[in-house]
């Protein structure tokens, strides 16, 4: 449940940044990508960045340019809410997080997440 709430909030922050942050709009301009963040059990959300805007979907999580697949929702929540970049690297190393698809899109999305400021909640 916490993981679903985190994904919802993340989607809202991405949408808000795409509308209100000049630097974020500049970062996503011209990028057309579909990123899925989900658990190994298949619960998650797709983040679609297209034409300078962000939309989200909770269905059709099989199609993605890149996917971040967490071993479970509790681990994902713990790592993502920590705000610690090293925790993401540790999760990858420990196989608690798997990346699928285009690795460049995976890194681009993590960079986009890093550009979200706390004021954009």
List the model feature ranges, each with a label:
Residues 1-121:
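Feature captures hydrophobic
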């Amino acid at each position: 449940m916490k993981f679903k709430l985190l994904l919802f909030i993340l989607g809202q922050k991405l949408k808000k940044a795409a509308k209100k942050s000049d630097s974020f709009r500049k970062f996503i301009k011209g990028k057309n990508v579909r990123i899925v963040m989900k658990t190994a059990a298949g619960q998650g959300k797709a983040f679609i960045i297209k034409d300078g805007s962000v939309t989200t979907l909770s269905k059709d999580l099989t199609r993605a340019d890149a996917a971040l697949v967490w071993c479970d929702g509790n681990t994902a929540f713990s790592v993502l809410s920590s705000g610690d970049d090293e925790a993401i690297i540790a999760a990858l190393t420990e196989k608690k997080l798997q990346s699928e698809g285009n690795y460049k899109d995976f890194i681009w999305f993590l960079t986009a997440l890093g550009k979200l400021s706390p004021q954009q909640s």
